């Protein structure tokens, strides 16, 4: 199977998000990379589902709460930017203050 670098990045992100999802389900608090991966994957999947950039910017803030992550993680993540593919092309989605 031949994958482009972008496809490899998306696959890596999905794998990291899947691991984060499983750890969260076990009651573990997520670290920085796990939190970023889970929120980013939610944005990518939302774009695939046909949601708008505005919807994803809003929904991206609801993926995780402070209780879901280790101490200090919310302060480390001021913005998450994800280049997502929409039906009308690729767009940059920025989620501001993703962990409330």
From Swiss-Prot:
Belongs to the urease gamma subunit family. CDD domains: Urease_gamma. This is Urease subunit gamma. Its EC number is 3.5.1.5. It is an enzyme of class 3 (hydrolase). It is found in: Cytoplasm. GO terms for cellular component: cytoplasm. InterPro entries: Urease_gamma, Urease_gamma/gamma-beta_su, Urease_gamma_sf, Urease_subunit. Pfam families: Urease_gamma (PF00547). One of its GO terms (biological process) is urea catabolic process. Signal peptide: none annotated. Keywords: Cytoplasm, Hydrolase. Transmembrane segments: none annotated. Pathway: Nitrogen metabolism; urea degradation; CO(2) and NH(3) from urea (urease route): step 1/1. The gene is ureA. GO terms for molecular function: nickel cation binding; urease activity. Heterotrimer of UreA (gamma), UreB (beta) and UreC (alpha) subunits. Three heterotrimers associate to form the active enzyme. It catalyses: urea + 2 H2O + H(+) = hydrogencarbonate + 2 NH4(+). It comes from Paracidovorax citrulli (strain AAC00-1).
């Amino acid at each position: 199977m031949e994958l482009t670098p972008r496809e490899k990045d998306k696959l890596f992100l999905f794998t990291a998000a899947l691991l984060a999802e499983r750890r969260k389900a076990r009651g573990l608090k997520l670290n920085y990379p796990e939190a970023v991966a889970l929120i980013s994957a939610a944005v990518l999947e939302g774009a695939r589902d046909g949601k708008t950039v505005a919807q994803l910017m809003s929904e991206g803030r609801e993926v995780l709460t402070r209780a879901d992550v280790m101490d200090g993680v919310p302060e480390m993540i001021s913005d998450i930017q994800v280049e997502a593919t929409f039906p009308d092309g690729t767009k940059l989605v920025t989620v501001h203050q993703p962990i409330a």
